[in-house]
Design a protein with these regions (language model features):
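Alpha-helical segment proximal to the catalytic Tyr-Lys
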Residues: 125, 174-176
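C-terminal substrate-recognition "lid" of short-chain dehydrogenase/reductases
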Residues: 2, 220-244, 249
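Residue(s) in the substrate-gating loop at a strand-loop-helix junction
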Residues: 146
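Active-site helix of classical SDR
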Residues: 120, 162, 170
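Catalytic Tyr-X3-Lys loop
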Residues: 87, 98-118, 142, 166
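Short, small/polar-rich loop/turn modules that mediate ligand/substrate recognition or access, typified
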Residues: 178, 183, 238-240
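Canonical Rossmann dinucleotide-binding motif of NAD(H)/NADP(H)-dependent dehydrogenases/reductases
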Residues: 2-33
Length: 253
């Protein structure tokens, strides 16, 4: 899918990996739309890169439809959806204070997995209405999972389950949406230098970086964005999950 001139929506696009994706798409000539719960950060970034910012929740159907409808009305229709919105609340199944509250588990699943699916299904409906491009292509969806989907650590039951669900969505979604000319791929990032990690002490950051075989450093969000670019532009990549992690395999703790 050619990025230049395409209308794109990035969820969680106001910071971290989503911000890097939004900047990449804008730099390559896309009409960028950002959907994020942080109004101030979203509007600030939108002003910098010439994007449109929407304040909303990916699990809210009305919020999602509003942003997608605006994005679908630009150019020749919605062509790109990149799902980066997510949360990472930790909690043990059975901790010192008893079992993990079910509401805590449900919240992580709802935001990460249900939110991703909600955006994907609604975006697909709009992409299917767009005119065909060369080869019958109509759109591409890139979802964000995590290496926790494969090596969830202690305290990550909810997070790992949510990201594992996103990994499992890739192939059936790609197969179902193929008849509409819509591709679906997923990136499973390792440890990246996001605002959350940047808030940690330097020695903690270095300790995390030393766990990565090569290169022995934290991932740069721009590298995540470049992987998303590849998945958007390479028309033959479909139904795939790409680990982007410097060959790290997370330990139990």
């Amino acid at each position: 899918m050619k990025i230049s001139g395409a209308s794109a929506l990035v969820t969680g696009g106001a910071s971290g990996l989503g911000e890097a994706v939004a900047r990449m798409l804008a730099a390559r000539g896309a009409f960028v739309n950002i959907l994020d719960r942080n109004r101030e950060a979203g509007e600030k970034l939108a002003g910098e890169i010439g994007a449109v910012s929407f304040t909303g929740d990916v699990t809210n159907e009305d919020d999602a439809k509003f942003a997608l409808d605006i994005a679908a009305g630009v150019g020749d229709g919605l062509r790109i959806l990149v799902n980066c919105a997510g949360i990472g609340t930790a909690g043990r199944i059975l901790g010192r204070e008893g079992p993990l509250p079910l509401a805590d588990f449900e919240r992580v699943i709802r935001v990460n997995l249900v939110g991703t699916f909600n955006m994907m299904r609604l975006a697909a409906a709009r992409m299917a209405d767009a005119p065909e491009r060369e080869g019958g292509a109509r759109g591409v969806i890139v979802n964000t999972a995590s290496v926790a989907a494969f090596e969830g650590q202690v305290g990550q039951a909810a997070y790992a389950a949510s990201k594992g669900g996103i990994v499992s969505l890739a192939l059936p979604a790609a197969r179902e949406l193929a008849r509409f000319g819509i591709r679906v791929n997923t990136v499973a990032p390792g440890i990246f230098l996001t605002p959350l990690l940047q808030s940690l002490p330097e020695d903690v950051q270095q300790s995390l970086a030393q766990q990565i075989p090569y290169p022995p450093r934290l991932g740069d969000p721009a590298e995540f964005a470049d992987t998303v670019r590849y998945l958007i532009e390479n028309e033959y990549v479909n139904g795939e999950v790409i680990r982007l992690d410097g060959a790290i395999r997370m330990q139990a703790r």
